[in-house]
């Protein structure tokens, strides 16, 4: 693949992955609205930027790098949280990157981001139920304890399906929608730098 043959692309993606890992650590609790273990972060901002700049492969690589770094340096979930973040991040940046690559304009970016946000919320609903939360029980948490964290916020929750539907699905969609808005605000300003166009333009003027 041409992406892997371009050293500049690889270095840029590695830097974006490192930034993503830092943003994962700078997460925000949302008390009284979400269970304590669900936190807001914008760690996928570098990933969606990479997906727009270099295609879906770039976005996927940033998701992989940031989660590997977080697993090594800051994980307290035995890798389960990183796996969840990787799944949701890829479900967001891959469709968004494909759509933007095909429709390389602002409308394409909006549609791609919306599709990615919906896809991530949908994928997260099932991946959490069948993969992530069962893995959490292997770390010492019982499923009843997990559901209990939801009932502290909304006592009418009875099942994991309900918990995921009422909390995780809208939270995931809104999180990636906010990430998309931030991307729209900064992408055009940094895109030439990411792709090295600004430097080449300066060199051309000097010549």
Each predicted region: which residue ranges?
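Loop-helix junctions at membrane interfaces
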Residues: 1-207
């Amino acid at each position: 693949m041409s992406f892997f043959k371009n050293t500049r692309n690889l270095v840029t993606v590695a830097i974006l992955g490192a930034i993503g890992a830092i943003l994962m650590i700078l997460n925000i609790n949302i008390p009284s609205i979400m269970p304590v273990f669900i936190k807001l972060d914008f760690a996928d901002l570098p990933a969606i930027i990479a997906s727009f700049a270099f295609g879906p492969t770039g976005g996927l690589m940033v998701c992989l790098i940031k989660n590997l770094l977080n697993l090594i340096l800051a994980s307290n979930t035995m890798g389960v949280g990183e796996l969840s973040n990787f799944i949701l991040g890829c479900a967001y940046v891959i469709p968004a990157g494909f759509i933007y690559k095909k429709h390389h304009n602002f409308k394409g970016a909006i549609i791609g981001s919306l599709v990615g946000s919906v896809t991530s919320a949908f994928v997260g609903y099932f991946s959490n139920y069948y993969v992530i939360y069962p893995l959490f029980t292997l770390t010492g948490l019982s499923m009843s304890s997990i559901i209990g964290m939801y009932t502290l916020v909304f006592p009418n929750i009875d099942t994991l399906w309900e918990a995921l539907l009422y909390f995780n699905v809208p939270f995931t969609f809104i999180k990636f929608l906010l990430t998309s808005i931030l991307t729209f605000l900064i992408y055009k300003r940094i895109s030439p730098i990411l792709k090295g166009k600004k430097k080449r333009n300066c060199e051309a003027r000097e010549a």
